[in-house]
Amino acid sequence: PLSSVEGQTQARLLRYLGYDVPDDEPMLFGKVRRLDERLLRALDIDTRSVGEIFRPQESQFQFLADDLYIDEWGIKRRFTGMYWDIVENPLKNATCADLDRYRWPDADSIDPAQIEAHVRRARELKEAGEYVVCAEHPVYGVFELGCWLCGFDDFLMRLFVDEPFVRKLFDIILNYQK
């Protein structure tokens, strides 16, 4: 029921339908571009999504250049025109001891006001009674983070040959998700 669309595509469609559209800017990975309300109404879409990936204030997040940043998990990403591709997996070939030394994001530093804003929006939509309200996941999953932190090849191999590492990594991620 959730929908999103790449920004340039949405802008072209809105212009085609006769709407004014501001210039588009690339979004960070994990941030979902909300479909423009005018487009949702024009297409008679009866769902509205609420939520986003929460970014803790205490993490490794930093911009390195206009097209390069390190996300809250320490994963380096480069904007390649449409997507933010992973260019560095910080835990590739890591050991269990490396997991102990790694700088993990602090879930307790997520701004409570950010969470409350989504709760308010969900309540407003529910009380209006016009749409099905769909919540988005506020954190990434354990499997995808494993692949992104270690690299797909490294992590998939570890699933079969390094159970202690995988269990420890999953415990850390699941503890963050609490």
Question: Where are each of the predicted segments found?
Answer:
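Catalytic cores of TIM-barrel enzymes
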Residues: P1-K178
